[in-house]
Amino acid sequence: MLEGRILAVSSQTKAVSGIPGAPKRVSFAKIREPLEVPGLLDVQTDSFEWLIGAQSWRERAAARGDSAISGGLEDILAELSPIEDFSGSMSLSFSDPRFDEVKASTDECKDKDMTYAAPLFVTAEFINNNTGEIKSQTVFMGDFPMMTDKGTFIINGTERVVVSQLVRSPGVYFDHSVDKGTEKDLHSVKVIPGRGAWLEFDVDKRDTVGVRIDRKRRQPVTVLLKALGWTTEQITERFGFSEILMATLEKDNTAGTDEALLDIYRKLRPGEPPTKESAQTLLENLFFKDKRYDLARVGRYKINKKLGLNLGQPIVASTLTEEDIVATIEYLVRLHAGDTEMTAPGGSAVPVEVDDIDHFGNRRLRTVGELIQNQIRVGLSRMERVVRERMTTQDVEAITPQTLINIRPVVAAIKEFFGTSQLSQFMDQNNPLSGLTHKRRLSALGPGGLSRERAGLEVRDVHPSHYGRMCPIETPEGPNIGLIGSLSVYARVNPFGFIETPYRKVENGQVTDQVDYLTADEEDRHVVAQANSALDANGHFTDDRILVRRKGGEVEFVSSAEIDYMDVSPRQMVSVATAMIPFLEHDDANRALMGANMQRQAVPLVRSEAPLVGTGMELRAAVDAGDVIVTEKTGVVEEVSADYVTVMADDGSRKTYRMRKFARSNQGTCANQRPIVDEGQRVEFGQVLADGPCTENGEMALGKNLLVAIMPWEGHNYEDAIILSQRLVEEDVLTSIHIEEHEIDARDTKLGAEEITRDIPNVSDEVLADLDERGIIRIGAEVRDGDVLVGKVTPKGETELTPEERLLRAIFGEKAREVRDTSLKVPHGETGKVIGIRVFSRDDDDDLPPGVNELVRVYVAQKRKIQDGDKLAGRHGNKGVIGKILPQEDMPFLPDGTPVDIILNTHGVPRRMNIGQILETHLGWIGKTGWNVQIAGDGSRPDWAEQLPEEMLSAPADSNIATPVFDGAKEDELTGLLGSTLPNRDGEVMVASDGKATLFDGRSGEPFPYPVSVGYMYIIKLHHLVDDKIHARSTGPYSMITQQPLGGKAQFGGQRFGEMECWAMQAYGAAYTLQELLTIKSDDVVGRVKVYEAIVKGENIPEPGIPESFKVLLKELQSLCLNVEVLSSDGAAIAMADGDDEDLERAAANLGINLSRNEAATVDDLAN
């Protein structure tokens, strides 16, 4: 029997994927997997360990047999060394990078806005070549950001992720096109280095072979060969077989090497006087010098592989060689001639074919380590320039490595990368799954990658070589579709940056447990069978003809003797988020894409609930995401409280695990951990001690299991609207906690220092009631918009004093300085409870930006119940907005009186073809009620239950079920189990074997005319909450030039009354309504103040004036030198001067309206 664990926990297996103490989940899986899911964060952590040359990485490399490889930092220092001065009399070299301890813990860094980093030291050796004197020193190279064990970086207190980049691998690429005019076949080849100049060869429609160096003008290829020192005889000897190359040679009239060199120089450097020496140096520098040209190990490997050059030897030369160029040309002419095979002198035979640049053999991954390494290379090369200059200016005797080195450019380069690079992103912390997916993301965008505009359809499309490497389903909708992907579950990245996926070896028709990781190139050479091919107990295929796939994704039936490999697992091709969709095989791909993406937008609820119907992936995903706490050593739980768990390990050591309590995530959701173990309980290594957000008993739990009826209801769930029961509001089933951070700082200004104080001018005592003596709000205070969180005053400019005031000052001394209120207030539309305050002050030696004396952060939490307008979704792309919340007594109910929780419309299913949601609903009901399969007297099972594992024949109520992707419950099994569900306590079975029940109308008590599908579906509350979107404004800020209200909630803007809305008003002839919309409600500056005055005084609304936008139009026409005048009805010119300013100022001052743009005048301010 083949060994290997079944996917999820069943009653016999103690654990799933090696995690002890896992909750029980009954699984439908029928295929055994010989391989555990690898660490889901390895793509990040392994790469960073390579960069810093960590011990664990060295051990892994040695186990793989890569003993010669050095770490990323060592590589780059070796590449830089030695730095020589211009005369070559002295040199500086670097070696042995090493790190000190990290300065502060991750929590401290987040709290104090610090970067989680360790000091980097290198050994620098200065050699004076004239005297032979060597000076060696340890040099500090700046603080180097370190990766946390969760694969993230903490930069200035915020958690960030560096996304892996998909780029075209260095190497040679052959291409084929057809000439539009002559319909001739044209072939071309590009030699793409890791860095340096491109070299391109092509055969044009006149059948001549040409070359372009560094994207300059085309020349005959024989010119380049002659420039490399080849004589006409040598060229004829090597390429005599090719007519087109011989024809090119005849047309080329350069005499010898010197003339060819000059010819190339003229094309590359037009306008400079060519000499033989400068031409020779130019060509050398372009392709044959380490400093200027680098193929990288991967480029050398690809070129050797493609052209069949010295394949056996280790990879050494990182520059081009003459043989590379000649072999490339030969390959090109053979490709044009239609040959199928080529053997380079001293090399091995390779097939001659064009390349597909979207193939994963030609696209590689730049992971974190390499991206940082490239950035450090930039910084070091800037530093190298400084070192050279200092070598020439400083006194040779006094020079030490320390005096030569300036680390600023290196530190700046690293800072720039983490702070501003497109690939260093603010981590998505909506829930554990979104964080995990973010770390496994593959992006084709970014520096050195594609841009959205230039990327065509081919790059974005699903390619056969993505299988098992990049998920074909999980990608964003919109402009980035296909450019951003997600790593498949079992994929890993090899040292060259190519993505590998595991396969089981098949020998003579027998499947072994030997697992080989193959790159896309290697996989093309083999015949691969699917994971669900039927096997017998010895691993032999049971069918005569087996469905396999060959190169290019073609499928066919072959005999078992021809098969080389077999898939490791049915979920090999999908990513983690996609692998968490049950019945994925019954969903249309477009909807599955939405389902995978929407799981990442799930908001952590107050109480998490694991899904009744899962896929067996929930536990591993939650544990690897790192938001749950796992035991580091086997032992016994000694003490448990809400804040920490202490474990006494078997070796006598104690470890205290601290919980994160109600912390704010990057997205403003609430990250809270709580223990799930008891005192005295024995815990194994790797067991879950505490749940985080969106987890239950260590399993990912993004939503809730709700009783759903799938039916239309009075048209209230038309167009994907959702009807909910009031119970979900009252019992806080879909309630989430959101935490906002508000920050204010007190700075030094030109007029004096700002001050955080309780003493605010012109403010009533009620407003200050919740502030403490410092002027900061107390913890636990309930606040709503406009309330003061932190009192602050700013000095105002001294005004001209009247003689009376001056006299009073002279008598009574210095009067209190004029200050204005610049307190931190709760933004418009937000409410909540203050749960935390952090005060940083210069006096306490806190690290603050220059000019800032004090910084206060206030955390306000709000509990958001579910309400109309919030967005809910299932896992199958079935999303909708809540249209109505019905009282519990009006909801349809089952025959035993149970009201349903949620009503979804039937019309959302057929056209979208996501039938998975219906199957999930049925299986959810089966799991909730429990089941018992009737076994005949002779022990035989019903036909549908033949395939079921033994422990699946019966289960109690509330059983969690796993139905793995592509290996889940079959339709006949569902029908059979629906007929075997356990009765309720009255002995009745509510739902028939077709999955439908007779529902009764809650309002009338009458049964609905048709049976309705009822069951349990996993429903997720998404981050699109109506509270964050709803917005209203009376008065507020105006745009500087047009004087119209700003737009958008963030700017506290108004609602736009656009062109089409105006047409609607015109159609109804609503002239006066339209006039006030376009003038006094918008940009008639004087009019709107007068209207406000009239409303306050209870007078009639005055006549509208001239809108500001009309004045702007006039000015724009005048700026085009057009003389535009405004005429009144009697033909007299009207002056459009801003003559009304005085009236405006007077009216505004009387009303206390602030007309400056910066501070929004709210109604509350005016009331004060």
Swiss-Prot record:
E.C. numbers: 2.7.7.6
Name of the encoding gene: rpoB
Subunit description: The RNAP catalytic core consists of 2 alpha, 1 beta, 1 beta' and 1 omega subunit. When a sigma factor is associated with the core the holoenzyme is formed, which can initiate transcription.
Entry-linked InterPro entries: DNA-dir_RNA_pol_bsu_ext_1_sf, DNA-dir_RNA_pol_bsu_external_1, DNA-dir_RNA_pol_su2, DNA-dir_RNAP_su2_dom, DNA-dir_RNAP_su2_hyb_sf, RNA_pol_bsu_bac, RNA_pol_bsu_CS, RNA_pol_bsu_protrusion
One GO BP annotation of this record: DNA-templated transcription
Gene Ontology cellular component annotations, sorted alphabetically: DNA-directed RNA polymerase complex
Any one Gene Ontology molecular-function term assigned to this protein's record: ribonucleoside binding
Protein family (similarity comment): Belongs to the RNA polymerase beta chain family.
Top-level taxonomic group: Bacteria
Keywords from the UniProt entry: DNA-directed RNA polymerase, Nucleotidyltransferase, Transcription, Transferase
Catalytic activity: RNA(n) + a ribonucleoside 5'-triphosphate = RNA(n+1) + diphosphate
Pfam families tied to this protein: RNA_pol_Rpb2_1, RNA_pol_Rpb2_2, RNA_pol_Rpb2_3, RNA_pol_Rpb2_45, RNA_pol_Rpb2_6, RNA_pol_Rpb2_7
Job description of the protein: DNA-dependent RNA polymerase catalyzes the transcription of DNA into RNA using the four ribonucleoside triphosphates as substrates.
Protein name, entry field: DNA-directed RNA polymerase subunit beta
